[in-house]
Every structure is written in C-alpha cells, then in structure tokens.
C-alpha cells in the first residue's frame, strides 16, 4: 500500500497551474510564476525565460555543458559541469517564505552567483535536509553546501572525505552521512572503480555503521522516510532508526526481465514511492515498505527521460525514443495516456548525444527539442501542445523553478 505523505494536498495547490496568474485582493496579489532554465548541448550557456512571457529572458555563460538542478527551494539553479570540473550557481530570482496558512513569493531577475566550485569531475548532486551535496568522482571527496546560505548567494562548502575516488554520492540521513563505498581493487586505464555499497559515517568521515552491500550502486532518491539506491542485486532502501541507519535490500523478483537493473530513481514528494528505470525499455514502481515492492511497466520504445509530477504525486511522465510522451499512473503501475510530442530521437549512439529532456511546470510538461531548437509546452491534462519557445542553439538539459505565492 502506497503511503500518502502529509502536506501533499497543500503542495498540489501550491504547484497547480502554469505560466503567470494574478488575483487581485485588497491586501495582496496571488502570483503563479514558472521560470525555465535551459542548458545548451554544444556551447557553455544557460538560457532562462519566464514560461508565460518567454520574451522575458536572460543568458548566462558557463564554462562547459551543464546539468541543471533546482535547489534551495527553487531559489538557486546549480549548473554542474562534469567535463569542465566546475559547478556554477544562478539565483533564480524567485523565492518563497512560508507563513503557515500561505507562503509569500518574491520575484526579481535571475543573476549569476559570483562564487563557484571547482574540483575533479563533479557529478551527482543530492539535496536533502537543507543540504546540497556534490560528489567529485575523481577527487575522493564530496562538498556540502548549506541551502539557505546558497539562496543568499554564499557558496562556502564543507568537505566530506572518501577513502577512494569513485562515481558515487553522499547524502545526509538522520544524524549521519551516507556515502557510497568503492573497492580497493586495482583498475587499469579508464576502467571504473568497483562500487561495493553504502555506509554511514560521521561528518569527519569516520564509520558510524557497517557497509550495506549494494554492488555497482548507482542512482539515489528520497521519498518519505526512505532513501533508495539501485544495485546489481536489487534496490537498497535506508531509513534513520533509533540506533542508526536501517537498511533493507529489495531483491529484483524472478518475474522481472533478467539481466538488467535499476540505476536511476525518482522519489515522490506526496506519497512514499519511487519510480525507477529498469533496463532501456522499462520502468518499475517501487514501494519501500509493502509488497509487492516492484511493479513493472513495459514501455513501447526505449526511454529517453522521465519525471514525476509534484502537484499530482501519483503521476509520472516518460518520453520514449519514438517522440511519444506517456502519462504513468503510479497507483496502477501502467501507462494511461500517450501523445506524440517530438520527432523520433534514437537511443543508439553516445549517451550524451543531444536528446530531449523533460521537467514539470505546474500543469505543463516542458520538453527540450534540441534538433528543432525549441522548448515545447505540453498540457498535463491531455498531452496537447500549448505552444513552443524558440531557444538559440541546441536546448538540452532543463530545470524549472517557481510556483504560487502571495505578494503583499
């Protein structure tokens, strides 16, 4: 049974609606605003625009190609540039202040934050419990930022040491830090360092528990009380317990396709459930508590990108290589609607070839279309196209900030 999380209804009300709306009252204005940030595939550049008024746009130079993350409650967009050994930050120009029965919204122009991070191949970014954590795959450490300070333009990281550099992640949970752990096995050339599993540490990097086996650990997400990570054997779940981190491995069941694993996970904010990839043409809905832990969704074509809808926690979307966007019902674990939204983009070729990416913006899904030089606006209601926004170059990775609030 999927567990609903407190605050889901409020979240849905907060995020519902798209574009920009105002409702005048004697004392306040209700404002809904979404701002879209798009990274170019070929040149170091991020383009930002307001969804309902795309002529309100800004351009930010970057060192290299970016992966974009909305962090610090949407006040900041992190631009992770793995190949350029750099992480830059952009203040989104949108911030929220919670007042219990409502939240205030402040809107201004986006602006680059002067401070940036540099280090050997930053890759996975994890945000949880007010912390933003970046793993340096070739550095043997992670850097930890305070989300509130980052929203104020301060990037002053602390460092979490790892025993060996590897492609992994670090995340806070309870009073400890969870870190992937690599083997000390010698590797040749560009071969990846084997990853053994997940372990709890204190802030100085001292072990605070035993290693939980999760061979080839990759991908992480939070939902409710749990963190989940993909493994060769199954999906490892972790929650904070009275005596430290509590681990449970959910083995892949025999009735799932064999020879493939989960390596990318998304966590719902309104119900305690995860959506993960399962091979190139499948998804799994994962319940960390109740059986069946896995429910498999076969896709008609290979997956290009997928996302969860924060306003409708039981809903997800997946784009497949034929150019179709599919709505996923997580409660039923099935595709409930589909529509063609782009030309086909084959998954053959390099993993980083220019292909569409999707993100949620209230009652719209925004889809980058690199070959067309567009961001497409797709209605969640019926998957119809509401409009397109031209973006110079090859629009690729995407992040959205914003929502609804009150101005006084």
UniProtKB/Swiss-Prot annotation:
Induction trigger: Up-regulated upon zinc starvation.
Disulphide bridges, residue numbers: 214-231
Residues that bind Zn(2+) 1: 124, 167, 218
Signal peptide: 1-21
UniProt-reported outcome of changing residue 167 to A: Loss of zinc binding to site 1 and no effect on zinc transfer to AztC
Motif N-terminal Zn(2+)-binding motif: positions: 23-29
One cellular component term from this protein's GO annotations in UniProt: periplasmic space
Function description: Acts as a zinc chaperone in the AztABCD zinc transport system. Directly transfers one zinc cation to the solute binding protein AztC; the transfer occurs without the formation of a stable interaction. Binds 3 Zn(2+), two with high affinity and one with low affinity, and transfers only Zn(2+) bound to site 2 to AztC. Likely functions to store zinc in the periplasm and may be important for zinc accumulation in zinc-limited environments.
Protein name: Zinc chaperone AztD
Origin species: Paracoccus denitrificans (strain Pd 1222)
Gene: aztD
């Amino acid at each position: 049974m999927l567990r609903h999380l407190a605050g889901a209804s409020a979240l849905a009300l907060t995020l519902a609606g798209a574009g920009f709306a105002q409702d005048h009252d004697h004392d306040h204005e209700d404002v809904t605003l979404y701002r879209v940030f798009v990274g170019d595939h070929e040149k170091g550049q991020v383009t930002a625009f307001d969804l309902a008024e795309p002529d309100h746009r800004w351009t930010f130079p970057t060192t290299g190609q970016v992966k974009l993350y909305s962090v610090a409650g949407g006040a900041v967009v992190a631009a992770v540039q793995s190949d350029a050994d750099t992480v830059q930050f952009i203040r989104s120009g949108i911030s929220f202040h919670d007042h219990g029965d409502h939240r205030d919204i402040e809107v201004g122009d986006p602006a680059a934050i002067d401070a940036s991070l540099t280090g050997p191949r930053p890759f996975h970014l994890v945000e949880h419990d007010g912390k933003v954590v970046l793993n340096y795959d070739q550095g043997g450490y992670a850097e930890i930022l305070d989300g509130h300070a980052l929203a104020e333009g301060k990037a002053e990281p602390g460092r979490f040491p790892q025993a060996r550099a590897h492609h992994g992640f670090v995340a806070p949970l309870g009073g400890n830090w969870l870190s992937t752990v690599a083997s000390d096995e010698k590797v040749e050339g560009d071969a990846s360092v084997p990853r053994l599993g997940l372990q709890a540490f204190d802030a100085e990097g001292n072990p605070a528990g035993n290693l939980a086996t999760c061979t080839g650990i990759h991908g992480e997400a939070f939902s409710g009380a749990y963190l989940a990570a993909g493994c060769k054997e199954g999906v490892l779940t972790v929650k904070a317990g009275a005596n430290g981190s509590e681990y449970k491995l959910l083995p892949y069941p025999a009735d799932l396709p064999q020879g493939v694993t989960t390596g990318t996970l998304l966590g719902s904010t309104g119900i305690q459930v995860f959506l993960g990839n399962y091979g190139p043409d499948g998804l799994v809905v994962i319940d960390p508590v109740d059986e069946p832990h896995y429910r498999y969704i076969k896709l008609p074509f290979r997956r290009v990108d997928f996302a969860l809808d924060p306003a409708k926690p039981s809903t997800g979307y997946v784009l497949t290589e034929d150019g179709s966007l599919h709505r996923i019902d997580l409660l039923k674990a099935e595709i409930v609607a589909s529509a063609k939204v782009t030309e086909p983009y084959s998954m053959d070729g390099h993993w980083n070839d220019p292909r569409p990416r999707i993100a949620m913006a209230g009652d719209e899904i925004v889809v980058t279309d690199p070959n067309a030089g567009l961001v497409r606006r797709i209605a969640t209601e019926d998957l119809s196209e509401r409009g397109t926004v031209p973006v110079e170059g090859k629009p690729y990775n995407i992040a959205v900030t914003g929502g609804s609030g009150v101005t006084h």
